[in-house]
Amino acid sequence: MKVVTGATDGIGRSYALDLARRGFNIFLISRTKSKLVKTKKQILNKYSDIEVRYAICDFTRVSYEDYKRLLHSLNEVDIGILINNVGMCFDNPEVLHRVEGGIDTLTNVINVNILPVTLLTAGILPQMMARKSGIIVNIGSAAGSIHMAKWSVYSATKKYIEWFTSILQKEYENEGIICQTITPLLVSTNMIKNPLSSIFCPNSDSFAKSSLNTIGNSSSTTGYITHQIQFELIKFVPEIIIDLFVKNLNNQLLDYQLDKKRV
């Protein structure tokens, strides 16, 4: 069984569909039952010879007991791949004390971006250790490698994922378990409020297919060739130029939001 969190939208949904295309049984985790039912139906309509299970979990409101119940359900099956995809960011770029929603939003971003990847990984590793086999894919972001003004907490939580996974690689390198970080740049999803795809901003289906093909080949990658090219080039760019790029990106996102409100 292959597990995907945040599995009913964007990259997570695309991961689930592409894993199903490859013939794997899927375990979907998301917060909205209607979307889970719809996604399960869509998968089975295309790939009727696989099994699809799901669990409802809102990671902004999840308790310790909720995590225990979720892990109990997950450990009832053999999990070959865990894709920790669920994530959350601010609605709009903003300096820390002016983030829309204030402390509630900041708490949600921290809870969603850090706790699931940590606790689900810890809860599923024992069965992988027993089999000496398993794959854990943690979806971060290039934002974790860049000091992005007006994305402070989001960027910092993505750095956590990168650091966390690199340590797991050291801890489990001789246990038959693959731990991989995916750090994409822009992907056309609802999270970035930009539906337009391009050579440098692929749609989620193209990204997921490319990313899955990197498992076993790279321990840390952007998951997509044009993203990797950009990421390697960024290493040679002075930070003042990167700051200007981030500022321009923030303005574009704000303009897009304003245009949507005018429609």
From Swiss-Prot:
EC number: 1.1.1.-
Keyword hit for Lipid metabolism: yes
Alphabetized UniProt keyword annotations: Lipid biosynthesis, Lipid metabolism, NADP, Oxidoreductase, Steroid biosynthesis
Presence of the UniProt keyword Metal-binding in the record: no
Pfam families the record matches: adh_short
InterPro entries: NAD(P)-bd_dom_sf (IPR036291), Sc_DH/Rdtase_CS (IPR020904), SDR_fam (IPR002347)
Location of the active site: 154 (proton acceptor)
GO biological process: fatty acid elongation; steroid biosynthetic process
GO terms of molecular function: oxidoreductase activity
Top EC group: oxidoreductase
Cellular component, GO, one term: endoplasmic reticulum
Family as reported in the entry's similarity comment: Belongs to the short-chain dehydrogenases/reductases (SDR) family. 17-beta-HSD 3 subfamily.
Protein name: Putative steroid dehydrogenase 4
